[in-house]
Every structure is written in structure tokens, then in C-alpha cells.
Regions:
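Glycine- and acidic-residue-biased ligand/ion/polar-headgroup-sensing regions
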Residues: 50, 55-60, 65
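Conserved short histidine dyad/triad with adjacent acidic residue
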Residues: 32-47
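A short, N-terminal "cap"/entry segment at the start of jelly-roll beta-barrel domains
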Residues: 1-29, 109-113
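Short acidic-glycine-tyrosine-enriched beta hairpin
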Residues: 67-81
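Ligand-binding loop in jelly-roll beta-barrel domains
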Residues: 81-107
Length: 113
């Protein structure tokens, strides 16, 4: 049976909503619907699975391993499992994107430094 969920019904706030697959029948994917203000984003971290960023509006600077990627709306950034990564919104307006975790739950290890 299909499930239909309104964005506002997902846990979170005005800048981030979270979907965990384990809470929706064990679907093997989780994601954030993100709207990051300029200069905001997570510090470097890793996941034991790949993460895919789909940019809908704005732009961001992504750290992926030793690489820096400038990405804008219409781009997809894929970070392999275990690779240190993070991003900061670089556009004058919010960076709107979907951050897809290829797991039914989100596991994050923050990197010092």
C-alpha cells in the first residue's frame, strides 16, 4: 500500500524536515528536505552508506574527501560511504536541497578538526 505524507507532517522545522525509512514501513532510504541560509551547513562528518544531494535552488560549497565542489540548482552530488564530507550554502538565498541517505535510518559520525 502506498503512503502519502505532507512535508509539514515530517518532523523538523522551517529549515529542515526529516524522513526516516524505518518509520515508514522499513523503506531502505531516509532523507532531509533542507533549506540552509547562506553560510550554514553541517561540519565534516561521515556515514557508513552513500549520501546523495539533489540541489533544487541556490548553490553550495561541498567538501567531499579532499575535493571541494561548487554545485548549484540542478546538480546532484554523490558522496561514497565513509568519505568525510560537509557543505555550506553559498548563494544569497537559501540552498534548498534533498539530502538522501541510502539507509532506513541516519547514522552520522562527526569528524574532529
Amino acid at each position: 500500500m502506498a503512503t502519502h505524507i505532507q512535508n509539514d507532517d515530517l518532523p523538523g522545522n522551517a529549515t529542515s524536515r526529516t524522513f526516516l525509512g524505518r518509520d515508514h514501513g522499513g523503506v531502505p532510504v531516509s532523507f532531509f528536505i533542507q533549506a540552509s541560509p547562506t553560510g550554514h551547513g553541517p561540519e565534516p562528518h561521515t556515514h557508513p552508506y552513500a549520501e546523495v544531494f539533489v540541489l533544487h535552488e541556490g548553490s553550495g560549497t561541498f567538501l567531499a574527501g579532499k575535493e571541494t565542489i561548487e554545485a548549484e540548482a540542478g546538480s546532484v552530488v554523490v558522496v561514497p560511504a565513509g568519505e568525510v564530507h560537509g557543505f555550506k550554502a553559498s548563494s544569497t538565498g537559501p540552498l534548498r536541497m534533498t539530502c538522501i541517505h541510502t539507509s532506513d535510518a541516519m547514522t552520522t559520525e562527526w569528524v574532529d578538526g
